[in-house]
């Protein structure tokens, strides 16, 4: 009889490092979900890498018994890109918060996504700067009163899902820290995807922005405001599936199913090459108090970056032969500048 049990246990993926997040932080549940998922993926710790930037979320590599790098602010996607190019055999995860990824790291993030580098990005979004003690972040709502905006923030927030879709990311998903199984499902889907995958995680900072997502994630609010996307299914939600989503006038809108009928509802297609419909879904909610989709927004196939680069180098080698650096240095060609 074949033994199909996992080769590792969740405890094998834990380290001896003391976890230094605040008690009650949503990061704990994300860490637990990841540790529980790893044995199910049946991957080797020696071939798994977690790379982070700066911030509360960035301590994640210390707590996973794998290779890892605690990088510099915003640069985790760039570091991960280099590693993915040099070692395409590795499982590479990138961890960062909304401040780290959407502010100083914004350019690195969108270029890693558009290039389709084979890395898996988890963006912990708590709509606040936590490590620096409570300033408004690029995802904070307009009017947010913080230490750095005592009269309220004037900045319109980024929507990470919209940004990712605008960068033509081939895999885009969203989950939240109150549902461990859903987190594991989204992380698993990201891992299975060949190319750049980003998962936004609604995460609670109970010290500096407590309850930011409770309008969506709190148990008594989920029926009214949490829309779970399922490929091939009409988009419905509510305690009795009494609400649905339609496309009207170029925008996604919430309707009563009794008013329009089931046949009028938008059927979710995560494999649709054009990201327009997924983008409309990402704009459905104007803030963390309205019906908000979670799940996989987009999962399309295109060649990942390292494969493209390898093919290009092979073509150059076939057409021009192997390079000779020593011969180049000894050549008589000179340039004046």
What kind of feature is each model-predicted range?
Residues 170-226:
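ATP/pyrophosphate-binding catalytic subdomain of soluble kinases
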């Amino acid at each position: 009889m074949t033994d199909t049990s996992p080769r590792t246990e969740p405890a094998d993926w834990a380290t001896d490092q003391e976890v230094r997040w605040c008690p009650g932080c949503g990061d704990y549940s994300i860490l637990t979900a990841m540790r529980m998922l790893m044995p199910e993926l049946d991957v080797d710790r020696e071939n798994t890498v977690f790379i982070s930037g700066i911030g509360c979320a960035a301590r994640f590599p210390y707590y996973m018994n794998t290779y890892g790098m605690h990088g510099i602010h915003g640069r985790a996607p760039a570091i991960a890109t280099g590693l993915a190019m040099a070692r395409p055999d590795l499982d590479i995860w990138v961890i960062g918060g909304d401040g780290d990824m959407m502010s100083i790291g914004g350019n690195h993030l969108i270029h890693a996504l558009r290039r389709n580098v084979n890395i898996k990005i988890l963006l912990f979004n708590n709509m606040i700067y936590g490590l620096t003690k409570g300033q408004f972040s690029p995802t904070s709502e307009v009017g947010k009163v913080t230490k750095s905006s005592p009269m309220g923030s004037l900045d319109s927030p980024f929507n990470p899902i919209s940004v990712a879709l605008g960068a033509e990311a081939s895999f885009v998903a969203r989950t939240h820290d109150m549902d461990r199984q859903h987190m594991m499902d989204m992380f698993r889907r990201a891992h299975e995807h060949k190319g750049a995958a980003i998962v936004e995680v609604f995460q609670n900072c109970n010290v500096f922005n407590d309850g930011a997502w409770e309008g969506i994630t709190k148990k008594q609010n989920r029926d009214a405001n949490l829309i779970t996307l399922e490929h091939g299914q009409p988009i419905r939600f509510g305690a009795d599936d009494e609400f649905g989503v339609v496309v009207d006038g170029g925008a996604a809108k919430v309707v009563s199913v009794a008013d329009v009928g089931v046949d009028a509802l938008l059927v979710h297609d995560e494999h649709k090459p054009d990201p327009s419909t997924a983008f409309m879904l990402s704009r459905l909610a104007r803030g963390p108090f309205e019906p908000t989709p979670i799940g996989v927004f987009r999962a399309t196939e295109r060649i990942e970056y390292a494969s493209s680069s390898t093919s290009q180098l092979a073509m150059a080698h076939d057409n021009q032969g192997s390079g000779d650096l020593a011969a180049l240095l000894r050549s008589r060609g000179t340039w004046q500048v």
